Amino acid sequence: MPVFTDVRPRWSRPASGGAHPPECRVKPLPELTAFLEGLPEPHILFDAQYRILASNAAYRRQFSPQRSVIGRHCYEVSHHFAVPCDHAGESCPLALSRQSGQRERVLHLHHTPRGEEYVNIELSPLPGEDGQPAFYVEKMEPLRVAHSQPDAPGLIGRSLPFQRMLALVARVAPSQASVLLLGESGTGKELVARAVHQASPRAGKALVAVDCSSLTETLFESELFGHERGAFTGATATKPGLVEAASGGTLFLDEVGDIPLPMQVKLLRLLETGTYRRVGSTELRHADIRVVAATHRDLDRMMADGRFREDLYYRLCTFPIALPPLREREGDIALLAPALLERVAAPRRLQLSASAMALLQVQPFPGNVRELRNLLERAALLCDGDVVDATHVEEAIATGRRPGRAPAAPPLPRSPAGTTDLRSLERDTLRALVAAHTGKRAELAARLGVSERTLYRKLRQLKLD
């Protein structure tokens, strides 16, 4: 924990024999409490039974402004859990620290007066006189680049695959390491790159995106490094490159797998030496950039085929992050769909009906979030009222279907009046479709625009099989 760099050794540094001399033992609780109170980030001190012994003003203000936290369990105050985090499906830094005997760091979704917030937690054990941990200190820093609510900016999600990805973003962002984002098309790689930038010390400078797939071999060098006046035909003025524009900030190389092989050598030199030359110049310039790259291509296969340099790959892939496809982010469609609909339908204020949401949640979305966005934009254009219903989603699916694909499903039956539970609506809809269908399940899946496996999974989940 960085804030304990200067003071923690006075509490916990062991002597050469392993024992803690009197001057290095844990100091009295009042002194620890006074130290925590002066820290700007939320901190708590608690024992091995998760009981909070002390908290600073920043913690009380963020998590429990109306009620004392002393004597309460940390998981109760921060998470509203009745059991420790690791018993509720989340990582528990205390449990991890007990196993490792070291400092631990995790990402949690905490409850605050403002609602749920993603929080980076760093836990440090403080040894007692016997050398064993006597207390634990947690430092909490909100991660502002992601949210679990649909009306928030930035990354949106709360599924476990999303949280695992977000934990990697939170871990690498404060460093200067190169990041390689890997994932299918439409998974939001540019949004994740922006999150890495905004959570980094370079957030005050520019994030410059380079679409590598749109640059020809002749344009790549002049766009990236810039050129001098007269360097080539048409170069009527000196032009700084994108590397220079990103100085002090982050250079985002989107679709890095599409960089021509001859240009990969020049990019490698930039990454290895931190220097470059404008086209037509002999002056060596220094690049102050952090590189985040992204691709949907299989770089391992490209390296095996000789289409991507292995040395460049290892320069870019200091810290790889795999972005989960939408089909693996169970529950996130319910968060993403309202947020995307609000953006694509503006200035109209459209709502999604429960039946429309149920239909969206059984779609496979091979195009991921981008496909979901396009589908919602079509549905909004097909809707004349204020509510996008399942019929609008069905029509949007049908009109967006590529030639040769299966026809759209028949209109969904209207749900019973007064039914508001989303799972019940989904069950009623599928039950009616299954009852009305006389052919094979594979045909029904095709008519719904989903795979047979997805249909069987939904039927099992809803106990309709």
Specify the residue positions occupied by each region the protein language model found.
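Sensory coupling linkers of modular signal transduction proteins
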Residues: 125-164
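Sensory modules in modular signal-transduction proteins
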Residues: 23-61, 174
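Bacterial C-terminal helix-turn-helix
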Residues: 1-27, 59-62, 111, 127, ...
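Conserved post-Walker A coupling segment in P-loop NTPases
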Residues: 168-234, 244-260, 325-330, 375
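PAS/PAC sensory module
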Residues: 105-109, 118-122, 137
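AAA+/SF3 P-loop NTPase mechanochemical coupling elements
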Residues: 238-248, 252, 260-266, 277-296, ...
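Nucleotide-binding/hydrolysis machinery
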Residues: 64, 202-205, 280-290, 298-404, ...
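Terminal output helix/cap of sensory domains in signal transduction proteins
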Residues: 67-109
